[in-house]
Amino acid sequence: MRTAQALAVCIFTAAQTYAVPPSVILGILHVEGGRVGMASKNTNGTHDLGPMQINTIWMPELARHWNVPEATAKRMVRDDACVNIGVGTWILRKKMNETGSLYKGIAWYHSATPRFGDVYRKKVMTAMQRYRLVRDPKDLVAAAVPRPAKRSPG
């Protein structure tokens, strides 16, 4: 188990690496509600893993990048909070770049289907405001500028 201080280092490192506001990472962590070692089964047969509930659809790409079997990538993402946070933040940055927007990136982290993604984005924004991570969503405008996603997830 990691200490709160170690997790804070993971969050701030991921935020810096992928140019994502730490408050957004914390908001997603709160909404996802995952834990180290957790694997939640989805109706489509995939699983969501660990604190940021990373979908197993990402395992082939991660396994190739890390040059490990998919089962190893899955264990790493599920069982290591820092790896999970790094991968989740990398995915969020990719979605931000695809959509050209922080807000749509947050929605697409969950689903590119507007009726699901928009509800999710609102939950993340509400969590950030509730925990006083931001005063107003406009505080995040500077983060909306697309940047290249680094090639290394996690």
Residue ranges and their predicted role:
Residues 1-153:
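Catalytic glycan-binding domains that act on GlcNAc-containing polysaccharides
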